């Protein structure tokens, strides 16, 4: 089973204190309980001289899979689920490519998600982004507000590359200002051994992002402006079933090809 190395290779994206981090998953949204556990964990770390419990961030080289984890070594449960995300995303990418489509095609990606039976939509995501003039570059400000873990280095460059590609798609797309351009992001979170995966399908149009598309993203803005970013949020219907994906396809490569063919059947 061959998977593009850009999908499987990850870049470190730094760390943040756990008490400052907001998890995306509803599973980990109960902050008092989280901090309770963190307090116990940090007490045991105190003896080693590090009293602050950290969350570490990583992003893959395509900018579509983002990790936030609290333990240096993932549990077997977390590894199985996160590895299966990689396999599923790779199969989706392959299916799109073999149909002459790509991950920017909102209708195609949404069709894969809705028809595959692996995902259930849980909510709409909206975030009002505040872009300041004469400050950091526009792309840096957007990334830091949407994915706070990415602050510098190679990981930030990956995310900037994604935004640059999206801007390129806007320029190359049809004159229809309401055509949606997409970005798919798998958010893999782990809290003291417990894994969770949230899937966000971000979308934008020339109409909604007119200010953004008319400005070079890699430069700072001469004026401050607000930008409303929307996304659909999904969870796996059965995380345990998804978690078995990677092992199955490692031992039965033909099943991976069957998955790609199955996904292609959901595309126009």
Curated annotation (Swiss-Prot):
Induction pattern: Expression augmented in cells that overproduce ethylene but significantly suppressed in cells that have lower ethylene production.
Keyword tags: Developmental protein
Annotated function: Plays an essential role in zygote formation by inducing sexual cell fusion. Overexpressing cells eventually formed many loose mounds, in which giant multinucleate cells were surrounded by normal-sized cells.
Protein name: Zygote formation protein zyg1
Source lineage: Eukaryota, Amoebozoa, Evosea, Eumycetozoa, Dictyostelia
């Amino acid at each position: 089973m061959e998977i593009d190395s850009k999908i499987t290779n990850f870049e470190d994206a730094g760390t943040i204190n756990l008490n400052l981090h907001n998890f995306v998953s509803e599973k980990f949204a109960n902050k008092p309980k989280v901090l309770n556990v963190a307090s116990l964990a940090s007490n045991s770390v105190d003896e080693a001289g590090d009293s602050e419990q950290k969350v570490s961030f990583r992003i893959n080289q395509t900018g579509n899979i983002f990790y936030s984890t609290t333990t240096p070594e993932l549990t077997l449960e977390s590894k199985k689920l996160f590895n299966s995300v990689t396999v599923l995303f790779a199969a989706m990418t392959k299916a799109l490519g073999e149909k002459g489509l790509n991950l920017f095609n909102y209708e195609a990606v949404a069709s894969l998600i809705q028809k595959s039976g692996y995902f259930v939509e849980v909510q709409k995501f909206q975030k009002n982004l505040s872009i300041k003039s004469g400050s950091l570059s526009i792309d840096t400000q957007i990334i830091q507000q949407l994915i706070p873990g990415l602050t510098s280095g190679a990981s930030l460059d990956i995310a900037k590359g994604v935004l640059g590609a999206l801007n390129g798609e806007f320029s190359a797309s049809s004159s229809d200002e309401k055509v949606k351009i997409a970005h798919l992001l798998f958010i893999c979170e782990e809290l003291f051994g417990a894994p969770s995966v949230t899937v966000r399908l971000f979308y934008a149009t020339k109409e909604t992002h007119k200010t953004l598309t008319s400005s070079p993203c890699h430069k700072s803005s001469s004026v401050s402006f607000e930008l409303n970013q929307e996304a659909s949020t999904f969870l796996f219907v059965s995380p345990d079933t998804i978690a078995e994906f990677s092992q199955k396809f490692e031992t039965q490569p033909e099943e991976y090809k069957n998955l790609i063919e199955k996904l292609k059947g959901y595309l126009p």
